[in-house]
Amino acid sequence: AILEEKYAKQIALVLDAAEPGMTISLDMKDAIDIAKKENSDLGSIVSIKDNLVVVKLSEKGGYSYSFFNDLQFDGVISNYYLNQAKTGFIFVIG
């Protein structure tokens, strides 16, 4: 739960400072290692909708945190995805 809170807040702060054209990489290896132990779908441990970041490392729990930047993650803002090494996420700001 502590890592979920940490990363939800960190991602929200990064998105608040983001501008179109930016690509942001975030190392989340410690959180991803926990999600693997919990047999979670690694691609869905981070979700973003309606200015709300949710980080969920297991079936139970999760932590959400809102951001204020008027970015939209519905195709306008390209996307976010697990990096190739599966150690973090990449956020592409459209």
Segments and roles (model prediction):
Residues 1-94:
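Long, compositionally biased, intrinsically disordered regions
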